[in-house]
């Protein structure tokens, strides 16, 4: 994105707006190895931030440039401003030139609260195609597909109070938001923490395949309906390198189930392939939702109010179909189903422990292909251990089903 999400598309109003998010900056060329110099505008060389850095506008790290952020640094950012990385950012990782961050010495990006708007005043996202009036809209960190992946690392980084940046992910007006955006970018992010994010913590698209390890994530908190899953991925991880979410914890809000409840999944994937291992999803309405997606969910604990793991259809790419593997998990929805496989999903569920489901079944299968082996299902308070309907192809062997309604 220069910043246009679909470079082959002609510029529309939304694309022009997105460019304005990043490019309407006063450009200054810092000296080589500058320290805490560029508070807004463009970094074109190498700059190091340490201690406290107070930004006063949008920042662009240009292609070929490098921003180094040392351990313990606090970056204060105005409410609706963002950082766009087209070159590289090395935050808290000694392998790329920064001092090593840790739990006791993290790097903190803190966005301020917006000023109270005057009558009829709107924020920078109130343009045709987006129409979001929030005064904080547009804040976050954007990692472009042009980044130097060999020099880019994020370690023990906290994003606090970002609203999220709106992005047209397909050039057709499909606007999604993210506080930390991976636009075709694939890099390692270790021990990230997200706090008070209005929309979505992480948005990955355009073939992005980041590895997120040891993270603390929260479902969006926006009260005007813009809140989203903690992680959203569209067309991510479908190449030779898959997207990974490892050793991470997710929390949110336990709203009522159903379309009127307003709840969001902790993880939402569409047309993506993602490896998820050793996750904890608790205190939220829904767990993970995979639409036309595949991958792995293993060695995890999913405790939700509504459905824990939803799948709809499967990922198909390059003439191949891909299975979603759900294995060795403890799955405990209070009211909803443990696992659903709907409308062409291809699922292998093995060695899971599923219980709860006061208003659902352990596995709900409709018009899908499911292999379920060596699972322990029950007690189930709602309906059945396995509820199969439609023209489904199901193989279930060596399961233990007990105490169903």
Range-by-range predicted roles:
Residues 29-405:
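Beta-strand/loop edge motif enriched in small/polar residues
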Residues 1-34:
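Secretory targeting signatures
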């Amino acid at each position: 994105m220069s910043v246009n999400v679909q470079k082959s598309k002609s510029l529309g109003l939304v694309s022009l707006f997105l460019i304005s998010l990043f490019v309407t900056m006063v450009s200054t060329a810092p000296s080589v190895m500058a320290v805490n110099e560029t508070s807004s505008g463009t970094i074109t060389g190498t700059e190091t931030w340490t201690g406290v850095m107070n930004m006063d506008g949008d920042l662009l790290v240009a292609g070929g440039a490098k921003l180094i952020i040392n351990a313990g640094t606090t970056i204060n950012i105005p409410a609706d401003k963002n950082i766009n990385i087209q070159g590289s950012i090395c935050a808290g990782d000694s392998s790329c030139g920064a001092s090593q961050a840790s739990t006791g010495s993290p790097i903190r990006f803190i966005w301020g609260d917006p000023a109270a708007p005057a009558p009829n005043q709107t924020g920078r996202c109130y343009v045709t195609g987006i129409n979001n009036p929030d005064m904080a809209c547009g804040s976050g960190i954007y990692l472009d597909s042009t980044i130097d992946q060999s020099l880019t690392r994020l370690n023990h980084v906290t994003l606090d109070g970002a609203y999220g940046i709106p992005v047209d992910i397909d050039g057709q007006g499909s606007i999604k938001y993210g506080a930390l955006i991976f636009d075709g970018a694939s890099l390692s992010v270790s021990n990230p923490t997200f706090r008070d994010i209005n929309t979505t913590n992480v948005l990955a698209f355009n073939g992005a395949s980041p590895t997120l390890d040891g993270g603390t994530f929260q479902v969006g908190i926006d009260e005007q309906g813009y809140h989203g899953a903690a992680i959203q991925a569209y067309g991510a991880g479908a190449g030779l390198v898959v997207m990974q979410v490892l050793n991470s914890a997710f929390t949110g809000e336990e709203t009522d189930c159903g379309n009127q409840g307003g709840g969001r999944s902790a993880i939402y994937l569409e047309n993506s392939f993602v490896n998820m291992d050793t996750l904890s999803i608790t205190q939220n309405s829904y767990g993970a939702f995979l639409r036309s997606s595949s991958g792995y969910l293993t060695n995890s604990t999913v405790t939700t109010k509504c459905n824990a793991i939803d799948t709809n259809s499967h990922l198909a790419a390059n003439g191949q179909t891909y299975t979603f593997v759900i294995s060795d998990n403890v799955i405990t929805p209070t009211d909803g189903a443990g696992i659903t496989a709907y409308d062409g999903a291809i699922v292998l569920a093995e060695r899971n422990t599923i219980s709860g489901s006061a208003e659902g079944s352990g596995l709900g299968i409709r018009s899908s292909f499911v292999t379920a082996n060596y699972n322990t299902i029950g007690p189930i308070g709602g309906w059945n251990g396995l509820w199969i309907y439609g023209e489904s192809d199901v193989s279930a062997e060596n399961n233990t089903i007990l105490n169903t309604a």
